[in-house]
Amino acid sequence: MPAKRQIAEARGRQAERRAALWLRLKGCSVLAARVKLPGGEIDLIARKGRLIAFVEVKARARRDDALGAVSVQSWHRIARAAEVWMGHRPKFAGYGWRYDLIALAPGSLPYHLKDAWRPGLA
């Protein structure tokens, strides 16, 4: 793997660890991280009560850049992976679920945008 790609991977893993810690501090259980499934990848899967959140994590120099860094195509891939993940976990059949985004930028707290995207609306 090229050095530039290794640095990006390391930064991504660090951002995901920070986001997972933030979710735990907010009372969520982190069920899984870096989940690769047919059709897509999910950065974090978290649970709070009877709600499952499929969380995309983005770290950029500015928070606004992180908030705009997920394309509609990426959300569709995340949604496909989420459907596969939920389909293999019947114990969560009665739970609600949503797609969240955690934006990270130097010098600021993580910004958790709940329900950042909904299938069929974009």
Swiss-Prot record:
<dbReference type="GO" id="GO:0003676">
    <property type="term" value="F:nucleic acid binding"/>
</dbReference>
<dbReference type="InterPro" id="IPR011856">
    <property type="entry name" value="tRNA_endonuc-like_dom_sf"/>
</dbReference>
<comment type="similarity">
    <text>Belongs to the UPF0102 family.</text>
</comment>
<protein>
    <recommendedName>
        <fullName>UPF0102 protein HNE_0764</fullName>
    </recommendedName>
</protein>
<dbReference type="Pfam" id="PF02021">
    <property type="entry name" value="UPF0102"/>
</dbReference>
<dbReference type="InterPro" id="IPR011335">
    <property type="entry name" value="Restrct_endonuc-II-like"/>
</dbReference>
<dbReference type="InterPro" id="IPR003509">
    <property type="entry name" value="UPF0102_YraN-like"/>
</dbReference>
